[in-house]
Structure formats: structure tokens, C-alpha cells
Amino acid sequence: MSIEDASFIAKAGTRAKRRKQEVEMGTLKQSEITPEPIGEGRTRYLAHTEKLMMAVIDFRDGPTREPDPPHSHPHEQISYVVSGELLVFIGDEQTRLEPGDMFTVPPDIPHTVQLLTEHVRLVDTFHPIRDAFLSK
């Protein structure tokens, strides 16, 4: 298989029909990913392989007075703060994060964020992939 053929299997694959990008090998430009609104002032960009998912989340509705409602999921999560500042709540712990900081969330642990600046960009990674994100 050539690099051109392998670059974006999603363009012809079933997951592409659900507006998501599955990457087998190669590169993916943000301009090639369909932005997905996930609430007022929030946009998600998804890419995934068979077992790993990455979500770039742009929050443009900060700062917020209160944290978002906590949630949990059976996936492992590692997140990287690209820009902005936020509080992250994981279980009973609260930490202020800035660009370059990271946080990890074990499966099934309640967690959430509170935006401290107008714009925050996170890169979230999940294993296994979050199938619920693909069916929306």
C-alpha cells in the first residue's frame, strides 16, 4: 500500500460516513477534520486509530463561574493543555493548569474542568476509543 493510499483510510471508510477521521498511517491536517460543535462556544476535532483516539477541544466560553458537571467513562485519558488556564477536578483533587501542563484520568473516575481564561485548548487522548463520540 502506498503512502498516498494509506494516509486517510477514513475518506473511504465507514467511520468517515459518521464525519470522523480514522487514520491508518500518515498525517492529518486540521483543515481536513470536520469541526464538531459540542455546546455553546465549544468545538471538538477528532481523529483515531483502531485503539487510540485524540480529541482537540476548543473552549471559547470562558472564564466560567463554576466547573462543568463531573462525568466519568471507562476509558483511560491523558490530556495536554495547549493554551489557556483551567482548574481540573479529578476525584477529590483540584489543580490549576497552564499551557504545557498535562493530566491523567483513570477509568471510571469522576472529573471535570473549570475555565479560568476566555479561550482554552486541550488535546485529549483516550484508550480505547470513545465509540459514543463516533456515533454523534
Question: Which residues are covered by each model-predicted region?
Answer:
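Ligand-binding loop in jelly-roll beta-barrel domains
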Residues: 107-132
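Short strand-coil-strand connectors
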Residues: 50, 89-93, 116
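A short glycine-rich, His/Asp/Glu-containing loop-to-beta-strand
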Residues: 34-69, 124
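Short, charged/polar surface micro-motifs in flexible loops or helix N-caps
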Residues: 52-53, 60-65, 83-86, 94, ...
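N-terminal amphipathic/basic-hydrophobic helices that include classical n-h-c signal peptides
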Residues: 1-21
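Short acidic-glycine-tyrosine-enriched beta hairpin
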Residues: 92-107
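Short, conserved beta-strand element in jelly-roll/cupin
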Residues: 59-60, 72-88
